[in-house]
Curated annotation (Swiss-Prot):
Keywords: Cytoplasm, Methyltransferase, S-adenosyl-L-methionine, Transferase. It comes from the Bacteria. CDD domains: AdoMet_MTases. GO terms for molecular function: protein-L-isoaspartate (D-aspartate) O-methyltransferase activity. GO terms for biological process: methylation; protein modification process; protein repair. The gene is pcm. It comes from Afipia carboxidovorans (strain ATCC 49405 / DSM 1227 / KCTC 32145 / OM5). The keyword Ubl conjugation does not apply. This is Protein-L-isoaspartate O-methyltransferase. GO terms for cellular component: cytoplasm.
Length: 217
């Protein structure tokens, strides 16, 4: 089978697998179909880009397994008018998916190497509504404004007040909460008029969100 034929089959199996596991939002499925995941993995991993497993990328980080990306994106409940913030750009894949679903995406990455690589990938795909920022996810500056949706793609032991302040009223935040090693809980927060409602979703495993900018890389 040719490489193009194999790729088409892998993408079909990828979509069918997501549907079998309960991903049903058509906009999310279209976004995942539209974004070529193989362009966000390391060259030696291109043949397994659509396997349902996390893959290593630069700076000791990972690109999350496809089901987790799909699940988190669906649970974020995006709308085309939304402005979204991502903490932990990584490969840029999650930001690319969100770019198909939201008006604007701002993604914050502590590693300059990852930020530069993701920025180039996103530009190559024509994701003009994505801004990549080198910064500290624990200290998001006021200058970035507020957001309808926030997604954190690294584990936090506690959610910083500075991040909650970036969330608009009626906004939704998804964040893995728990220890840096072991299993965390994916939590959905909704900022309502009477305070913040918290809902536990599924157990997950993410690399830890670290404080500050990386001194190297």
């Amino acid at each position: 089978m040719s490489a193009s034929g194999r790729s088409a089959r892998e993408k079909l199996n990828f979509q069918l697998g997501l549907r079998r596991r309960g991903i049903s939002d058509q906009a999310v499925l279209r976004a995942l179909e539209d974004v070529p995941r193989e362009q966000f993995v390391e060259p030696h991993d291109k043949e397994v880009a659509y396997a349902d497993t996390a893959l290593g990328i630069a700076c000791g980080q990972t690109i999350s397994q496809p089901y987790v990306v799909a699940y988190m994106t669906e649970q974020l409940r995006t709308h085309p008018r939304h402005r979204a913030l991502e903490i932990g750009t990584g490969s840029g894949y999650q930001a690319a998916v969100l770019s198909r679903l939201c008006r604007q995406v701002v993604t914050v990455e502590r590693y300059r190497t990852l930020a530069d690589t993701a920025r180039a990938r996103l530009a190559a795909l024509g994701c003009r509504n994505v801004e990549v920022v080198v910064g500290d996810g624990y200290d998001v500056p006021d200058t970035l404004g507020t957001f309808d949706r926030i997604i954190v793609t690294a584990a936090m032991e506690t959610i910083p007040d500075s991040l909650m302040e970036r969330l608009e009223p009626d906004g939704i935040m998804l964040v893995p909460v728990g220890p840096p090693e072991g299993v965390q809980q994916l939590v959905r927060l909704r900022k309502g008029a009477d305070g913040v409602e918290q809902e536990d979703l599924i157990p997950v495993r993410f690399v830890p969100a670290l404080v500050g900018l990386a001194k190297e890389l």
